From Swiss-Prot:
The keyword Translocase applies. It is a multi-pass membrane protein. Coiled coil: none annotated. It is found in: Cell inner membrane. Its main location: membrane. The gene is rnfA. GO terms for biological process: electron transport chain. This is Ion-translocating oxidoreductase complex subunit A. It holds the Pfam family Rnf-Nqr. Keywords: Cell inner membrane, Cell membrane, Electron transport, Membrane, Translocase, Transmembrane, Transmembrane helix, Transport. It comes from Azotobacter vinelandii (strain DJ / ATCC BAA-1303). Its EC number is 7.-.-.-.
Length: 194
């Protein structure tokens, strides 16, 4: 049980996939202008990350390794991610049509979000990660992505009404803010011993 908590905390804070491993930067910068949109995408991405991590483990364990097809891992994982994203898109459209319209093109673009493929590949490469550990790591990666995305969106909303010098407006102040957030998350680096 302690190991599962360490995997979860490690994925959320210590090895945050956005601020420490620099995966998922496209939606991080692109969807963080409004907090409502950021929350919606964060929830959808967390769901996709968790489900894709578990499905990728099953594909790796019960299809690719027994049939000696490990060279098809990346293509297989992309296929699994595409199916999970389509399922998520149908679920969001059915449960919240407003959120579906607000997210627009960003929902199907979760398929190309490198954090989803990165988590699946890292889970496959980690020796000793079983089905539950892969799911917990995917869920933790989703929570870490959500935490960072929502915090960044809240800061960008505040920055939008602030008096920012002209050379720093737009992407420049966004990248500076992301860099400061990354420095703050580096403070968690010694929290869990490898």
């Amino acid at each position: 049980m302690t190991e599962l908590v360490l995997i979860l905390v490690g994925a959320i804070l210590v090895n945050n996939f956005v601020l420490v491993q620099f995966l998922g930067l496209c939606p991080f910068m692109g969807v963080s202008k409004r907090i409502e949109t950021a929350i919606g995408l964060a929830l959808a991405t967390t769901f996709v990350l968790t489900l894709a991590a578990m499905c990728s483990y099953l594909l790796q364990r019960y299809v690719l390794v027994p049939l000696d097809l490990e060279y098809l891992r990346t293509i297989g994982f992309i296929l699994v991610i595409a199916v999970v994203v389509q399922f998520t898109e149908m679920l969001v459209n059915k449960t919240s049509p407003l959120l579906y319209r607000v997210l627009g093109i960003f929902l199907p673009l979760i398929t190309t979000n490198c954090i989803v493929l990165g988590v699946a590949l890292l889970n496959a490469n980690k020796a000793g990660y079983g089905f539950l550990e892969s799911g917990i790591n995917g869920f933790g990666a989703g929570l870490g992505f959500s935490l960072v995305l929502v915090l960044f969106a809240a800061m960008r909303e505040r920055i939008a009404i602030a008096d920012v010098p002209k050379p720093f407006k737009g992407a420049a102040i966004g990248l500076i803010t992301a860099g400061l957030m990354s420095l703050a998350f580096m403070g968690f680096s010694g929290l869990i011993k490898p």
